[in-house]
UniProtKB/Swiss-Prot annotation:
<feature type="DNA-binding region" description="H-T-H motif">
    <location>
        <begin position="31"/>
        <end position="50"/>
    </location>
</feature>
<keyword id="KW-0678">Repressor</keyword>
<dbReference type="InterPro" id="IPR050109">
    <property type="entry name" value="HTH-type_TetR-like_transc_reg"/>
</dbReference>
<dbReference type="Pfam" id="PF13977">
    <property type="entry name" value="TetR_C_6"/>
</dbReference>
<keyword id="KW-0805">Transcription regulation</keyword>
<dbReference type="InterPro" id="IPR009057">
    <property type="entry name" value="Homeodomain-like_sf"/>
</dbReference>
<comment type="pathway">
    <text>Amine and polyamine biosynthesis; betaine biosynthesis via choline pathway [regulation].</text>
</comment>
<dbReference type="GO" id="GO:0000976">
    <property type="term" value="F:transcription cis-regulatory region binding"/>
</dbReference>
<protein>
    <recommendedName>
        <fullName>HTH-type transcriptional regulator BetI</fullName>
    </recommendedName>
</protein>
<feature type="domain" description="HTH tetR-type">
    <location>
        <begin position="8"/>
        <end position="68"/>
    </location>
</feature>
<comment type="function">
    <text>Repressor involved in the biosynthesis of the osmoprotectant glycine betaine. It represses transcription of the choline transporter BetT and the genes of BetAB involved in the synthesis of glycine betaine.</text>
</comment>
<dbReference type="InterPro" id="IPR039538">
    <property type="entry name" value="BetI_C"/>
</dbReference>
<dbReference type="Pfam" id="PF00440">
    <property type="entry name" value="TetR_N"/>
</dbReference>
<dbReference type="GO" id="GO:0019285">
    <property type="term" value="P:glycine betaine biosynthetic process from choline"/>
</dbReference>
<dbReference type="InterPro" id="IPR023772">
    <property type="entry name" value="DNA-bd_HTH_TetR-type_CS"/>
</dbReference>
<dbReference type="InterPro" id="IPR017757">
    <property type="entry name" value="Tscrpt_rep_BetI"/>
</dbReference>
<dbReference type="GO" id="GO:0003700">
    <property type="term" value="F:DNA-binding transcription factor activity"/>
</dbReference>
Amino acid sequence: MPKVGMQPIRRRQLIDATLSTINDVGINDATIAQIARRAGVSAGIISHYFKDKNGLLEATMRDITRQLRDAVAARLRPLAQASTEARLLAIVEGNFDDTQVHSAAMKAWLDFWASSMHQPQLGRLERVSSRRLFSTLAAEFRRELPREQARLAAHGLASLIDGLWLRAALSGQPFNLETARTLTTQFIRQQLAGAAPHEKEE
Protein backbone atom coordinates (compact mmCIF):
# COMPACT_ATOMS: atom_id res chain seq x y z
CA MET A 1 0.00 0.00 0.00
CA PRO A 2 1.19 3.55 -0.70
CA LYS A 3 2.40 5.41 2.36
CA VAL A 4 -0.04 7.94 3.83
CA GLY A 5 0.62 11.38 2.38
CA MET A 6 2.56 10.07 -0.60
CA GLN A 7 -0.12 10.77 -3.22
CA PRO A 8 0.59 14.54 -3.62
CA ILE A 9 4.34 13.85 -3.71
CA ARG A 10 3.99 11.10 -6.31
CA ARG A 11 1.65 13.19 -8.46
CA ARG A 12 4.09 16.10 -8.34
CA GLN A 13 6.99 13.81 -9.29
CA LEU A 14 5.08 12.38 -12.22
CA ILE A 15 3.85 15.73 -13.54
CA ASP A 16 7.38 17.16 -13.33
CA ALA A 17 8.73 14.08 -15.10
CA THR A 18 6.07 14.46 -17.79
CA LEU A 19 7.08 18.07 -18.43
CA SER A 20 10.74 17.08 -18.57
CA THR A 21 10.03 14.24 -20.99
CA ILE A 22 7.89 16.43 -23.26
CA ASN A 23 10.67 19.01 -23.21
CA ASP A 24 13.12 16.40 -24.51
CA VAL A 25 11.09 14.27 -26.93
CA GLY A 26 7.66 15.88 -27.40
CA ILE A 27 4.23 14.72 -26.36
CA ASN A 28 3.79 12.09 -29.09
CA ASP A 29 7.07 10.30 -28.38
CA ALA A 30 6.79 10.52 -24.60
CA THR A 31 6.01 7.07 -23.22
CA ILE A 32 4.79 5.85 -19.86
CA ALA A 33 8.07 3.96 -19.43
CA GLN A 34 10.17 7.07 -20.10
CA ILE A 35 8.15 9.19 -17.71
CA ALA A 36 8.22 6.54 -14.99
CA ARG A 37 11.97 6.08 -15.37
CA ARG A 38 12.53 9.82 -15.11
CA ALA A 39 10.35 10.01 -12.01
CA GLY A 40 12.12 7.03 -10.47
CA VAL A 41 8.95 4.95 -10.12
CA SER A 42 7.43 1.92 -11.77
CA ALA A 43 5.08 2.30 -14.74
CA GLY A 44 2.37 0.76 -12.56
CA ILE A 45 2.43 3.84 -10.33
CA ILE A 46 1.31 5.97 -13.27
CA SER A 47 -1.57 3.59 -13.93
CA HIS A 48 -2.47 3.75 -10.24
CA TYR A 49 -2.70 7.54 -10.11
CA PHE A 50 -3.67 8.52 -13.66
CA LYS A 51 -4.93 5.31 -15.39
CA ASP A 52 -3.03 5.96 -18.62
CA LYS A 53 -0.89 8.42 -20.57
CA ASN A 54 -3.88 10.57 -21.52
CA GLY A 55 -4.86 10.88 -17.87
CA LEU A 56 -1.33 11.96 -16.98
CA LEU A 57 -1.25 14.51 -19.81
CA GLU A 58 -4.57 15.95 -18.70
CA ALA A 59 -3.32 16.24 -15.12
CA THR A 60 -0.17 17.97 -16.37
CA MET A 61 -2.17 20.49 -18.37
CA ARG A 62 -4.44 21.13 -15.39
CA ASP A 63 -1.35 21.76 -13.28
CA ILE A 64 0.07 24.29 -15.75
CA THR A 65 -3.26 26.13 -16.04
CA ARG A 66 -3.58 26.18 -12.22
CA GLN A 67 -0.13 27.77 -11.99
CA LEU A 68 -1.26 30.35 -14.55
CA ARG A 69 -4.39 31.20 -12.54
CA ASP A 70 -2.34 31.47 -9.36
CA ALA A 71 0.24 33.74 -11.03
CA VAL A 72 -2.45 36.14 -12.27
CA ALA A 73 -4.35 36.10 -8.96
CA ALA A 74 -1.19 36.79 -6.95
CA ARG A 75 -0.46 39.89 -9.03
CA LEU A 76 -4.03 41.19 -8.91
CA ARG A 77 -4.53 40.64 -5.19
CA PRO A 78 -2.72 43.79 -3.99
CA LEU A 79 -4.23 45.92 -6.79
CA ALA A 80 -7.90 45.99 -5.79
CA GLN A 81 -7.93 49.81 -5.83
CA ALA A 82 -5.40 50.25 -8.63
CA SER A 83 -5.96 51.74 -12.08
CA THR A 84 -7.32 49.71 -14.96
CA GLU A 85 -3.95 49.96 -16.71
CA ALA A 86 -2.10 48.61 -13.67
CA ARG A 87 -4.50 45.69 -13.32
CA LEU A 88 -4.31 44.83 -17.02
CA LEU A 89 -0.52 44.87 -16.89
CA ALA A 90 -0.67 42.58 -13.85
CA ILE A 91 -2.75 40.10 -15.86
CA VAL A 92 -0.23 40.29 -18.70
CA GLU A 93 2.69 39.66 -16.37
CA GLY A 94 0.86 36.75 -14.78
CA ASN A 95 0.55 35.16 -18.21
CA PHE A 96 4.29 35.60 -18.68
CA ASP A 97 5.16 34.23 -15.23
CA ASP A 98 8.25 32.02 -14.98
CA THR A 99 5.98 28.98 -14.60
CA GLN A 100 4.61 29.67 -18.10
CA VAL A 101 7.72 30.69 -20.04
CA HIS A 102 10.41 28.20 -19.04
CA SER A 103 11.38 25.79 -21.81
CA ALA A 104 9.49 22.74 -20.58
CA ALA A 105 6.26 24.66 -19.98
CA MET A 106 6.39 26.34 -23.38
CA LYS A 107 6.94 23.07 -25.22
CA ALA A 108 4.18 21.44 -23.19
CA TRP A 109 1.73 24.25 -24.04
CA LEU A 110 2.59 23.96 -27.74
CA ASP A 111 2.00 20.21 -27.67
CA PHE A 112 -1.20 20.60 -25.67
CA TRP A 113 -2.56 23.16 -28.11
CA ALA A 114 -1.90 20.79 -31.01
CA SER A 115 -3.33 17.77 -29.16
CA SER A 116 -6.41 19.70 -28.01
CA MET A 117 -7.72 19.66 -31.58
CA HIS A 118 -7.93 15.86 -31.44
CA GLN A 119 -8.47 15.03 -27.76
CA PRO A 120 -11.81 16.32 -26.42
CA GLN A 121 -10.72 16.57 -22.79
CA LEU A 122 -7.60 18.58 -23.61
CA GLY A 123 -9.71 20.67 -25.99
CA ARG A 124 -12.12 21.50 -23.20
CA LEU A 125 -9.28 22.55 -20.90
CA GLU A 126 -7.81 24.76 -23.62
CA ARG A 127 -11.18 26.46 -24.22
CA VAL A 128 -11.69 27.06 -20.51
CA SER A 129 -8.24 28.64 -20.24
CA SER A 130 -8.79 30.87 -23.29
CA ARG A 131 -12.23 31.98 -22.13
CA ARG A 132 -10.89 32.76 -18.67
CA LEU A 133 -8.21 35.04 -20.12
CA PHE A 134 -10.72 36.82 -22.37
CA SER A 135 -13.33 37.32 -19.64
CA THR A 136 -10.72 38.60 -17.17
CA LEU A 137 -9.37 41.12 -19.67
CA ALA A 138 -12.85 42.18 -20.81
CA ALA A 139 -13.94 42.82 -17.21
CA GLU A 140 -10.98 45.13 -16.67
CA PHE A 141 -11.42 47.02 -19.94
CA ARG A 142 -15.13 47.36 -19.12
CA ARG A 143 -14.17 49.65 -16.23
CA GLU A 144 -13.18 52.27 -18.82
CA LEU A 145 -14.78 51.32 -22.13
CA PRO A 146 -18.24 50.58 -23.56
CA ARG A 147 -19.11 46.90 -23.68
CA GLU A 148 -18.31 46.16 -27.32
CA GLN A 149 -15.16 48.27 -27.29
CA ALA A 150 -14.06 46.45 -24.13
CA ARG A 151 -14.64 43.09 -25.78
CA LEU A 152 -12.65 44.09 -28.87
CA ALA A 153 -9.82 45.39 -26.69
CA ALA A 154 -9.84 42.13 -24.71
CA HIS A 155 -9.68 40.08 -27.91
CA GLY A 156 -6.80 42.22 -29.14
CA LEU A 157 -4.79 41.98 -25.92
CA ALA A 158 -5.40 38.22 -25.61
CA SER A 159 -4.19 37.80 -29.19
CA LEU A 160 -1.11 39.90 -28.45
CA ILE A 161 -0.34 37.84 -25.34
CA ASP A 162 -0.72 34.57 -27.26
CA GLY A 163 1.26 35.89 -30.21
CA LEU A 164 4.20 37.10 -28.12
CA TRP A 165 4.23 33.81 -26.25
CA LEU A 166 3.99 31.73 -29.44
CA ARG A 167 6.79 33.58 -31.24
CA ALA A 168 9.04 33.12 -28.22
CA ALA A 169 8.18 29.43 -27.94
CA LEU A 170 8.92 28.79 -31.61
CA SER A 171 12.15 30.81 -31.56
CA GLY A 172 13.76 28.59 -28.95
CA GLN A 173 15.13 31.71 -27.27
CA PRO A 174 14.46 32.83 -23.68
CA PHE A 175 11.27 34.84 -23.30
CA ASN A 176 11.95 38.60 -23.46
CA LEU A 177 9.72 40.02 -20.75
CA GLU A 178 10.81 43.62 -21.32
CA THR A 179 9.77 43.52 -24.97
CA ALA A 180 6.45 41.92 -24.00
CA ARG A 181 5.87 44.62 -21.37
CA THR A 182 6.61 47.41 -23.85
CA LEU A 183 4.29 46.08 -26.56
CA THR A 184 1.40 45.20 -24.26
CA THR A 185 1.66 48.51 -22.38
CA GLN A 186 1.48 50.41 -25.67
CA PHE A 187 -1.59 48.43 -26.72
CA ILE A 188 -3.36 48.90 -23.38
CA ARG A 189 -2.72 52.65 -23.38
CA GLN A 190 -3.94 52.99 -26.96
CA GLN A 191 -7.19 51.23 -26.07
CA LEU A 192 -7.78 53.20 -22.88
CA ALA A 193 -6.96 56.49 -24.61
CA GLY A 194 -10.10 56.00 -26.67
CA ALA A 195 -12.31 55.97 -23.59
CA ALA A 196 -14.66 58.91 -23.09
CA PRO A 197 -16.26 59.28 -19.62
CA HIS A 198 -19.79 59.60 -21.02
CA GLU A 199 -19.33 56.42 -23.10
CA LYS A 200 -18.48 54.06 -20.25
CA GLU A 201 -22.10 53.12 -19.63
CA GLU A 202 -24.46 51.75 -22.23
